Each structure stands twice: as C-alpha cells, then as structure tokens.
C-alpha cells in the first residue's frame, strides 16, 4: 500500500485552511450570496453550520437582511429555531433590525412566534423595544402574546416604555385596553 494520495482523490484541507474556508462561507451568508450558498449546500455543506459564536448561516443571512439567501438556506432545511450561544434566534434578530419581510419569511418557514431567548425575550419584545410597529402588528396577528413576560417579568409594553419607544407603547396600550 502506498503512502501517497491517489491523483483522483481531493487533497484534505489543513485545519487552518478549513477555518479560513469556513469564515469565507459565513461571510457569504452575511453578504447574502444566495447563489454561492446554494452551490455549497448542493455539494453537502451543512445547512445548520455554526461559527465560533454559535451563529448559523441562517442567523447571519437573516440578521443582515438577505431574504434570497435565507430562502435558499430554508429550502436546504436550515432550522429557523437554532439559537446562537447567546440564545438569540433569527426571528428575534430580524425583529430587532425591523425587517418585516424577513420576519414573515421566517414565520412562514417554521420560526416559533413565541420562541424566546435564554432571558425569555421574544421577537415581539424585541420589536416593541425598537418601535417596530408593523412587526408588532404582524406578530400579534399571527398569535404572539402581548402579555408574555421575560425571565424578569417584563412584558413587551414594559420593554417599550423602558426603551422610550413611544409608537409601540401607544400601539400596545391601545391593543391591551
């Protein structure tokens, strides 16, 4: 038996090369390169690949607002419920950023409306904190509970008040009567 690699076998990446390649893949998600992600996924790249912070490709693409890349990842069975190491979900990131189209895309593909981070914060709470009135309307229309409390007993309305988010305070006060 020979110690050499046959010519038809690909060369194995070194650990450093693999780490560099992985970082390039995560950058493609951040940049929203849907075509490259589709090509890599079709070659066997795991759809739920995570970086050193626990962020998935889906988390990065959704946070940075790349709906086409998110759709490609979801088509390849990326899980919209995978949280990063801080307990943050893609839907909470999209709500924080104020991206209604992204929130809708994630919900339509299985994201839990009431899914909470480790501290109990939901996407509705994130939207309330940052005056994301359209997202609040959408999430409540889909069944989000405006009376839900985080681990500290804080509701979406409480969070909006704390952050000085006047529009969402008025919206939630009207809704809650």
Regions found by a protein language model. Name each.
Residues 36, 68-69, 101-102, 134-135, ...:
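Conserved ankyrin/ankyrin-like repeat signature
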């Amino acid at each position: 038996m020979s110690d050499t690699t046959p010519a038809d076998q690909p060369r194995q990446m070194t650990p450093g090369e693999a780490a560099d390649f992985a970082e390039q893949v995560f950058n493609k998600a951040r940049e929203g390169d849907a075509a490259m992600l589709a090509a890599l996924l079709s070659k066997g790249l795991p759809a739920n690949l995570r970086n050193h912070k626990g962020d998935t490709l889906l988390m990065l693409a959704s946070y940075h607002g790349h709906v086409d890349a998110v759709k490609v990842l979801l088509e390849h069975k990326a899980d919209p419920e995978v949280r990063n190491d801080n307990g943050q979900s893609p839907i909470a990131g999209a709500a924080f950023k104020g991206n209604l189209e992204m929130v809708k895309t994630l919900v339509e593909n299985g994201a839990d409306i009431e899914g909470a981070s480790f501290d109990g914060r939901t996407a509705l709470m994130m939207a309330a904190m940052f005056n994301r009135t359209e997202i609040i309307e959408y999430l409540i229309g889909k069944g989000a509970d405006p009376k839900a409390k985080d681990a500290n007993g804080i509701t979406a309305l409480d969070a909006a008040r704390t952050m000085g988010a006047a529009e969402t305070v008025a919206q939630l006060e009207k809704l809650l009567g």
